[in-house]
């Protein structure tokens, strides 16, 4: 826990927590807040390293005021800081799905139609509001 408290200080010093992802791509696109869960991102970073191909993150942390979150009755997985959307398609999408299931990600959303192709990953615990494990399509 102490280590994770040092993350903002490390960022100020130009030291990044993750091998494959920048702080900028993980912050809220609405307000630039840094709310991503470090333990969650360590899992994503490890997955990226194992697969060996780029994971362009289109959405990570979203503050409660983010337009997508503000439309919801209760904040979604992104507002918890434990979700990312990864732009991926074709055989890489297939490889990512297999690896994410093996790595223990509990929420997997798939959008592979038209120009919007991404896979949502989260690791939320099972709850009445959000049953996990769960897979859905957009």
Annotated model-derived regions:
Residues 1-14:
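Single-pass alpha-helical membrane anchors
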Residues 12-54:
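Active-site acidic/histidine clusters and adjacent loop/turn architecture
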Residues 19, 24, 59, 64, ...:
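Flexible, active-site-adjacent loop/turn segments at secondary-structure boundaries
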Residues 25, 65, 70, 74, ...:
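Solvent-exposed, flexible loop/coil residues
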Residues 30, 55-61, 91-95:
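N-terminal start-of-chain detector that recognizes signal peptides
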Residues 44-71:
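Extended, low-complexity, intrinsically disordered C-terminal regulatory tails
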Residues 75, 79-84, 88-138:
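Catalytic cores and adjacent binding grooves of peptidoglycan-active enzymes
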């Amino acid at each position: 826990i102490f280590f994770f408290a040092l993350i903002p200080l490390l960022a100020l010093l130009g030291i990044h927590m993750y091998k494959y992802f920048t702080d900028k791509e993980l912050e809220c696109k609405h307000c630039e807040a840094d709310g991503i869960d470090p333990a969650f991102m360590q899992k994503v970073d490890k997955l990226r390293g194992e697969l060996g191909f780029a994971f362009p993150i289109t959405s990570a942390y979203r503050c409660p005021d983010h337009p997508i979150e503000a439309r919801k009755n209760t904040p979604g997985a992104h507002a918890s800081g434990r979700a990312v959307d990864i732009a991926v398609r074709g055989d890489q999408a297939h490889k990512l799905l297999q690896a994410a299931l093996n790595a223990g990600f509990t929420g997997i959303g798939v959008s592979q139609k038209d120009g919007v192709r991404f896979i949502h990953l989260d690791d939320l615990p099972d709850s009445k509001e959000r049953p996990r494990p769960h897979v859905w399509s957009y």
